[in-house]
Amino acid sequence: MSTSKRKRGDDANWSKRVTKKKPSSAGLKRAGSKADRPSLQIQTLQHAGTTMITVPSGGVCDLINTYARGSDEGNRHTSETLTYKIAVDYHFVADAAACPYSNTGTGVMWLVYDTTPGGQAPTPQTIFAYPDTLKAWPATWKVSRELCHRFVVKRRWLFNMETDGRIGSDIPPSNASWKPCKRNIYFHKFTSGLGVRTQWKNVTDGGVGAIQRGALYMVIAPGNGLTFTAHGQTRLYFKSVGNQ
């Protein structure tokens, strides 16, 4: 009875064989999840000319996550949105009522989250419940204790403005000079990590009445009665998530 032996050449060829590696299921899942992520969208709100923001004593409150339903980049595509980042760029200009006085004031800008807006934007006094005696001092305002479950301050920024009793068109005499004051200031802020989730009703507009849960307001108040107008833009970075 004869036995067959494997030749050395066969052993060498066997060792040279390269086995193909199969891609792991974890790698496939990671690649797929990146492809399925919704892209970051941008909405820009411009305020200039006839759409400038007038900031009276006591402040102003405006809804900023105004994502109407649609197919454009600034529209919401689903019934839920997530606002991640906000860029604020404005020029604050003391108005005609404030310029005739020599004054300085510390104003405040807030980003306020409203869990249940109820179809109507609140006033600054509704949010902060300040007494009339503190109307001119917004740096002292705090969210109302009774409504702290509804309103959450996401960001708070201070700024200083000045007036010297003159208006911008005044011309100094030839033998004198006037040092500048902060009658007109540039205000810039960029903030991330907001994580504002908004649930929308089955309507197409982007007003506060269309929000079921999660409105985001920009609140601005002047300090010491130094009223002004705001000219510029707010840019919001968000995603459309959830169901169509």
Swiss-Prot record:
Disordered: annotated span: 1-39
Motif position, Bipartite nuclear localization signal: 1-24
One Pfam family of this chain: Gemini_coat
A GO molecular function held by the record: structural molecule activity
TM helices/strands, residue ranges: none
Cellular localisation: Virion; Host nucleus
Gene Ontology terms: biological process: symbiont entry into host cell; viral penetration into host nucleus
Classification via InterPro entries: Gemcoat_MSV, GV_A/BR1_coat, Viral_coat
Keywords attached to this entry: Capsid protein, DNA-binding, Host nucleus, T=1 icosahedral capsid protein, Viral penetration into host nucleus, Virion, Virus entry into host cell
GO cellular component: host cell; host cell nucleus; T=1 icosahedral viral capsid
Primary location class: virion
Function (record text): Encapsidates the viral genome into characteristic twinned ('geminate') particles. Binds the genomic viral ssDNA and shuttles it into and out of the cell nucleus. Plays a role in protection of the genome from degradation, virus acquisition and transmission by insect vectors, infectivity, and systemic movement. The CP of monopartite geminiviruses is absolutely essential for virus movement.
Description of how the protein assembles with itself and partners: Homomultimer. Interacts with the movement protein. Binds to single-stranded and double-stranded viral DNA.
Family to which the UniProt record says this protein belongs: Belongs to the geminiviridae capsid protein family.
Name of the protein: Capsid protein
Taxonomic source organism: Maize streak virus genotype A (isolate Kenya) (MSV)
